[in-house]
């Protein structure tokens, strides 16, 4: 659920939504539009969103996509937390392409709502040649994402924010607190880019 954002400083882009070293992202660093997704690998609506988001990524090579691992089901289903940590470690160790392959492979298992296994995670990690022995610590990154989600008023997944990479304001940012279609996401990208055509 989205409780709203305080726009008083007019600096949504400076809120931690823009890409930074610790957060997985895919797409050009100088993109004019950024799409940020908060997700949990065990969330069924995140799983339904995954193929829609994959379509949008392929259709928008000029947009930056930022992935905020937000394992809200981690206490109920430990694999949520394990998958999130592994994803962040792959990002830091192997980069954007390996991360996106891992991310999509986890969703491709079709295992959510408590069905994701350690074997699923290991297989997806092995496929991108992840070396667990040299994996960096990512707890600080997860804590930062959790704090940001709380600041934004997100308590569930998925949650998406589509914003221009510079000059974000209440007028050109779209917040989607829940599942959405590729078409609706594309409209939000066009809106953030300043394309007013309907």
Placement of each model-derived feature along the sequence:
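C-terminal cap of thioredoxin/glutaredoxin-like
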Residues: 1, 122-198
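N-terminal targeting signals for export/organelle localization
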Residues: 1-15, 198
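Envelope-exposed proteins and targeting segments
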Residues: 31-34, 61, 156-158
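Structural alpha/beta surface segment adjacent to cysteine/selenocysteine redox centers
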Residues: 36-42, 47-126, 152, 193
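Hydrophobic, well-ordered secondary-structure scaffolds
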Residues: 4-5, 10, 22, 29, ...
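A short beta-strand-turn-helix
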Residues: 16-33, 57-58
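Residue-level detector of conserved, well-ordered beta-strand and adjacent loop positions
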Residues: 27, 36, 177
């Amino acid at each position: 659920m989205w409780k709203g954002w305080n726009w008083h400083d007019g600096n949504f882009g400076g809120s931690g939504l823009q890409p930074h070293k610790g957060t997985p992202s895919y797409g050009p660093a100088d993109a004019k539009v950024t799409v940020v997704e908060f997700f949990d690998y065990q969330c069924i609506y995140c799983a339904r969103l995954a193929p829609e988001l994959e379509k949008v990524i392929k259709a928008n090579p000029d947009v930056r996509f930022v992935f905020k691992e937000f394992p809200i089901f981690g206490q109920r289903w430990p694999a949520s937390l394990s998958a999130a940590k592994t994803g962040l470690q792959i990002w830091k160790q192997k980069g954007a392409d390996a991360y996106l392959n891992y991310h999509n492979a986890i969703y491709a298992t079709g295992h959510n709502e408590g069905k994701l296994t350690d074997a699923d995670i290991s297989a997806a990690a092995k496929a991108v040649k992840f070396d667990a022995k040299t994996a960096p610590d990512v707890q600080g990154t997860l804590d930062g994402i959790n704090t940001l989600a709380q600041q934004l008023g997100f308590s569930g997944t998925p949650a998406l924010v589509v914003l221009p990479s510079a000059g974000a304001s209440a007028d050109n940012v779209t917040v989607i607190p829940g599942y959405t279609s590729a078409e609706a996401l594309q409209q939000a990208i066009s809106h953030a880019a300043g394309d007013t055509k309907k």
